[in-house]
Swiss-Prot record:
The lineage of its organism: Eukaryota, Metazoa, Chordata, Craniata, Vertebrata. This is Poly(U)-specific endoribonuclease-A. GO terms for molecular function: lyase activity; manganese ion binding; RNA binding; RNA endonuclease activity. The gene is endou-a. Its EC number is 4.6.1.-. Its cofactor is Mn(2+). It comes from Xenopus laevis. The keyword 4Fe-4S does not apply. It is found in: Nucleus. Keywords: Endonuclease, Hydrolase, Lyase, Manganese, Metal-binding, Nuclease, Nucleus, RNA-binding.
């Protein structure tokens, strides 16, 4: 393994595979959704908003929305996606209704086996308090507490917005958006134009049933040269992984190497003080671990 990739974390690999197996809300490839990978994406120079289009059709060919929205954690998650102002530098205003939606989502995921297992693990590590309510408050602060991305500006971002919704830097640079449901919904609204897959070095092309992908896309005219995302997994699965990695370290940037099913991944979590700045999976066989 290359030295800059770090050593495999066996403890987290075991835990994350247990969480993967417990993820009962995960959508199944070929049954609950279908994707079309099409062509391999081209190189996009830094700062460019031009990308060769190697995909004539959307990435998502089909998603069983009825099933998606019948699952409480997905339904409450989707209700949060329209609560944010896309541009950093524009102050966020959080309404009482949005606070209630945040709490409904946390209540829903805390009922799942995945989050109960994650909570139990964190309690054993003295990284979370044993009561569910205290853990919920901790999750709320980590993920939903607003902060400023630029020094001196008003609160304009939070971990949830960056990771799951996506945001822009002065309307010129695409940041975040590492979630497959948001990708699908934005693609459906014609806000996302999928440009092609970014291949792993040891594999000529991904498979249609791969559940971790590197993608290139335009979002509202801004290019994301490489965006990595789990596909099909539940919101609670991603919340669990990223929260565990965040709480395990005080480092500005945590990179935990894990083996999850067939994938060797780096789970990257960047902290913004006491909050999550960004979080995403990186397929280690790609040559660009520094996705943003």
């Amino acid at each position: 393994m290359a030295s800059n990739r770090g050593q495999l974390n066996h403890e987290l690999s075991k835990l994350f595979n247990e969480l993967w197996d417990a993820d009962q809300n995960r959508m199944k490839s070929g049954k609950d959704y279908r994707i079309s990978l099409q062509g391999k994406a081209g190189y996009v120079p830094a700062g460019s908003n031009q990308a060769r289009d190697s995909a004539s059709f959307p990435l998502f060919q089909f998603v069983d929305e009825e099933k998606l929205k019948s699952r409480k954690t997905f339904a409450t998650f989707i209700s949060l996606l329209d609560n944010y102002e896309m541009d950093t530098g524009v102050a966020e205003v959080v309404t009482p209704e949005e606070i209630a939606e945040n709490n409904n989502f946390l209540d829903a995921i805390l009922e799942t086996k995945v989050m109960k297992m994650a909570h139990d693990y964190l309690v054993r590590k003295n990284q979370a308090k044993p009561t569910r309510n205290d853990f919920k408050v901790q999750l709320y602060n980590i993920w939903f507490q607003l902060y400023s991305r630029a020094p001196g500006s008003r609160p304009d971002s939070c971990g949830f917005e960056h990771v799951f919704v996506g945001e822009s830097k002065r309307g010129q640079e695409m940041m975040g958006l590492h979630n497959w449901v948001q990708f699908y919904l934005q693609e459906k609204r014609k806000n996302i134009d999928y440009k092609g897959y970014v291949a792993r070095q040891n594999k000529s092309r991904p498979d249609e049933d791969d559940q971790v992908l590197n993608l290139q896309f335009n979002w509202k005219e801004m290019v994301k040269p490489v965006g990595s995302s789990f596909i099909g997994v539940s919101p609670e699965f991603e919340f669990a992984l990223y929260t565990i990695v965040f709480l395990a370290s005080q480092e500005k940037m945590s990179r935990e190497v894990v083996r999850l099913e067939e994938y060797e991944l780096q789970i990257v979590v960047n902290r913004h003080g006491r909050y999550i700045g960004t979080a995403y999976p990186v397929l280690l066989s790609t040559n660009n671990p520094d996705l943003y």
